[in-house]
Amino acid sequence: MDKIEVRGARTHNLKNINLTIPRDKLIVITGLSGSGKSSLAFDTLYAEGQRRYVESLSAYARQFLSLMEKPDVDHIEGLSPAISIEQKSTSHNPRSTVGTVTEIHDYLRLLFARVGEPRCPNHDVPLAAQTISQMVDKVLSLPEESKMMLLAPVVKERKGEHVKLLEQIAAQGYIRARIDGEICDLSDAPKLELHKKHTIEVVVDRFKVRSDLATRLAESFETALELSGGTAVVASMDEPETEELVFSANFACPHCGYSVPELEPRLFSFNNPAGACPTCDGLGVQQYFDEKRVVQNPSISLASGAVKGWDRRNFYYYQMLTSLAKHYEFDIESPFEALPKKIQQIILNGSGKEEIEFQYMNDRGDVVVRHHAFEGILNNMARRYKETESLSVREELAKNISTCPCHDCGGSRLRQEARHVYIGTTTLPDVAEKSIGETLHFFSELHLSGQRAQIAEKILKEIKERLQFLVNVGLDYLSLSRSAETLSGGEAQRIRLASQIGAGLVGVMYVLDEPSIGLHQRDNERLLNTLLHLRNLGNTVIVVEHDEDAIMAADHIIDIGPGAGVHGGQIVAEGSAKAIMANPHSITGKFLSGVEKIEIPAKRTALDKKKMLKLEGATGNNLKSVNLAIPVGLFTCVTGVSGSGKSTLINDTLFPLAQNALNRAENTQFAPYQSISGLEFFDKVIDIDQSPIGRTPRSNPATYTGLFTPIRELFAGVPESRARGYNPGRFSFNVRGGRCEACQGDGVIKVEMHFLPDVYVPCEQCKGKRYNRETLEIRYKGKTIHQVLEMTVEEAREFFDAIPQIARKLQTLMDVGLSYIRLGQSSTTLSGGEAQRVKLATELSKRDTGKTLYVLDEPTTGLHFADIKQLLTVLHRLRDQGNTIVVIEHNLDVIKTADWIIDLGPEGGNGGGQIIATGTPEQVAEVKGSHTARFLKTLLQKR
């Protein structure tokens, strides 16, 4: 069978579509945001492919797997087992790293366990057990006639007089010993000091090196090893300064006896007690109460609240500090920063063993005197955090916690034994810290010899293949030790894509969601080659994508539309790129052929050099002391290849700093920097990202934008409502009163099914309307509150035309292209792009001061060319009101319309972290050595 037949698909907004998809091809599904692409790809094709596979398993196995809901479709034929690679499922497990997710770490563990060489951490000598024959050969290789002695170390750096031991050695017939470096006669041994450390080595044999000594030496070594427990030393008698030969028959350091168990792969796993650093349990970081967070306001006194919860208002702790101030003679009313450093340390870390007289007043007003040490504010918080069972106390205390790399393993997560196993001069933590590109180069250049080369051959092949796949999807700048929870959606998705190629499956249907997200134009070609490679293996690759290169490279394109939401869900065009461009009804085709396009502004807004937001000396992650200058009142684009430092600079440094200063956010963590100036030009900073607007089915666009409040007030103002005494709360489905209590205002009831997915059935009482009968009797202009929530934004705009407060908010939702969503649509069903535009609309509808700093990270995710055009209109409108827009973006259509560009690079990871170009798009396009400039120049020449 060479095709997938879909008949009568009605999932979400799909309008009973029929479709024939060729198998073993690269298929791109495109269309406006919200047109039904994901409904077809994920909720129909993938869901059915996965469901059929899971249903073929036993009932016992099924209970452990989440079964997909059966899509609303008449018939699908020709499906293969399906694998979906989405962006949503980034791992939040702190133990997951790029190495563990891609399984490269498993191969590295095996490699180091089989061909690694353990070394002593103190003396940096290889730990190797030598045979007696090897020891004899080594001695016989010394110059002939050299006078040597063979010693057996019996005491190493141990205190004591050792009288008994010396007597025993003499009784065994030995004549001499070297005690603390001096040769002594055992019949006249010196008296040793009891409290000093001593080293005693017995002289087992003295000889001149000659070739016929082999048998004698073998016997002497045997005796020495038995006497010392496995160690022997050969020293020169003529030249004492010559380096001594130390031999060990144990797998141990001959100098200090340090030994490791047999090397096993689990010794190199930080998720196994055998390999994890015992201090941080293999997490690589430690939590501690940070004095910078605890002393929130050092410019005021302890009494006034320098430390939250320890001021006048908390009488118990305030009494403590008063007694402490009396004992150490400092003023509790002085600013904390003015107190002597020693006093500050006592307040934070405690008085040690020094006891202090504390006076406490009990409930009856009696003064009680107690003598004890002061534990210190930081220790007090740490103790309470450990002991408390109250979630609110724990959450409050957690605000003062910071994390730092583990002081024991330095963030490598492994125990000491694993950190000192080498291949050449490199350890496993060294390999994990390198960028993937460097790691691939290291293993390509690695030459092992003999038996080790044979053992490592297959392991190295697997490692190099997997690293090459990661490089091919544009992730060469990541390191294997990078925590999986710090990856962006696009990065996590491409890692899973690389893992799938590594798996080498054939005959599978892969469904991908915009794999080009977060990828610079430079890396796009490599990504497309990867997708084509998956197809060439014999798989059907279905990609939801808006990227022009991907659409042009596809074997078959499905364009869904014509509009979004209720206006979408139909197949507008399908076939090759040429067929799509020739179709007059396809918006995608119009943009591909150039009939429609996003215009380049005729002139750029000039910048005012006196009004700049400046951030200097930013050094977070890979930033190399970056000095950033953003023009106030302009639309600035921050560009650069993946991993060049854009997110670190904007999201981890600039945004949290501005948030602290402008929004008075408490305890926001930011990356290191030197200085920031220019924040006085703003009154607030807003980050408009693609995170969901609400995590529960109860939140919806009406509640998020603030529309629902005036709508409820309208219903409460209806004469019938007033006669019944209903207030606006009556029309909320979140509180008792007007909502249906059978389903608590959800409209559906969840039925748990153990071997099947949970089923949500409409509530029998309210028939899914969320409100009780009495509330639904109130009508405004003939409509109930439920009917209003079911309206699309477009219908509601017409319905509430006479109410400016509501109409304005609805108009902004239409301006950002969301005319099709329903007011009461659950926020969990909105795509990332839709959620972001709801936030944008909410901002647009507020009374504007023209002094806002907006930060957007890749706002074009999930947006079609037509949606991007609309988004840019909105952003330019915000800019025209005097606001400053900072956008991190790879999309050239956005970059070309910016007033100002800041390009980071030149490469990702360690090869990036510098600003390599700034200026208008025309100026940046001329910069040599910038990857962005190369693509931008081509685009600007098409004007």
UniProtKB/Swiss-Prot annotation:
<keyword id="KW-0067">ATP-binding</keyword>
<dbReference type="InterPro" id="IPR004602">
    <property type="entry name" value="UvrA"/>
</dbReference>
<dbReference type="Pfam" id="PF17755">
    <property type="entry name" value="UvrA_DNA-bind"/>
</dbReference>
<dbReference type="GO" id="GO:0008270">
    <property type="term" value="F:zinc ion binding"/>
</dbReference>
<keyword id="KW-0479">Metal-binding</keyword>
<feature type="binding site">
    <location>
        <begin position="640"/>
        <end position="647"/>
    </location>
    <ligand>
        <name>ATP</name>
    </ligand>
</feature>
<dbReference type="GO" id="GO:0009381">
    <property type="term" value="F:excinuclease ABC activity"/>
</dbReference>
<dbReference type="InterPro" id="IPR041552">
    <property type="entry name" value="UvrA_DNA-bd"/>
</dbReference>
<dbReference type="GO" id="GO:0009380">
    <property type="term" value="C:excinuclease repair complex"/>
</dbReference>
<comment type="subunit">
    <text>Forms a heterotetramer with UvrB during the search for lesions.</text>
</comment>
<dbReference type="InterPro" id="IPR027417">
    <property type="entry name" value="P-loop_NTPase"/>
</dbReference>
<protein>
    <recommendedName>
        <fullName>UvrABC system protein A</fullName>
    </recommendedName>
</protein>
<dbReference type="InterPro" id="IPR017871">
    <property type="entry name" value="ABC_transporter-like_CS"/>
</dbReference>
<keyword id="KW-0267">Excision nuclease</keyword>
<dbReference type="GO" id="GO:0016887">
    <property type="term" value="F:ATP hydrolysis activity"/>
</dbReference>
<dbReference type="InterPro" id="IPR013815">
    <property type="entry name" value="ATP_grasp_subdomain_1"/>
</dbReference>
<dbReference type="Pfam" id="PF17760">
    <property type="entry name" value="UvrA_inter"/>
</dbReference>
<keyword id="KW-0863">Zinc-finger</keyword>
<comment type="similarity">
    <text>Belongs to the ABC transporter superfamily. UvrA family.</text>
</comment>
<keyword id="KW-0862">Zinc</keyword>
<keyword id="KW-0677">Repeat</keyword>
<feature type="binding site">
    <location>
        <begin position="31"/>
        <end position="38"/>
    </location>
    <ligand>
        <name>ATP</name>
    </ligand>
</feature>
<keyword id="KW-0742">SOS response</keyword>
<keyword id="KW-0963">Cytoplasm</keyword>
<feature type="zinc finger region" description="C4-type">
    <location>
        <begin position="253"/>
        <end position="280"/>
    </location>
</feature>
<comment type="function">
    <text>The UvrABC repair system catalyzes the recognition and processing of DNA lesions. UvrA is an ATPase and a DNA-binding protein. A damage recognition complex composed of 2 UvrA and 2 UvrB subunits scans DNA for abnormalities. When the presence of a lesion has been verified by UvrB, the UvrA molecules dissociate.</text>
</comment>
<dbReference type="InterPro" id="IPR041102">
    <property type="entry name" value="UvrA_inter"/>
</dbReference>
<keyword id="KW-0228">DNA excision</keyword>
<keyword id="KW-0547">Nucleotide-binding</keyword>
<dbReference type="GO" id="GO:0003677">
    <property type="term" value="F:DNA binding"/>
</dbReference>
<keyword id="KW-0227">DNA damage</keyword>
<dbReference type="GO" id="GO:0005524">
    <property type="term" value="F:ATP binding"/>
</dbReference>
<keyword id="KW-0234">DNA repair</keyword>
<dbReference type="GO" id="GO:0006289">
    <property type="term" value="P:nucleotide-excision repair"/>
</dbReference>
<feature type="zinc finger region" description="C4-type">
    <location>
        <begin position="740"/>
        <end position="766"/>
    </location>
</feature>
<dbReference type="GO" id="GO:0009432">
    <property type="term" value="P:SOS response"/>
</dbReference>
<keyword id="KW-0238">DNA-binding</keyword>
<feature type="domain" description="ABC transporter 2">
    <location>
        <begin position="607"/>
        <end position="937"/>
    </location>
</feature>
<dbReference type="InterPro" id="IPR003439">
    <property type="entry name" value="ABC_transporter-like_ATP-bd"/>
</dbReference>
<dbReference type="GO" id="GO:0005737">
    <property type="term" value="C:cytoplasm"/>
</dbReference>
<feature type="domain" description="ABC transporter 1">
    <location>
        <begin position="310"/>
        <end position="587"/>
    </location>
</feature>
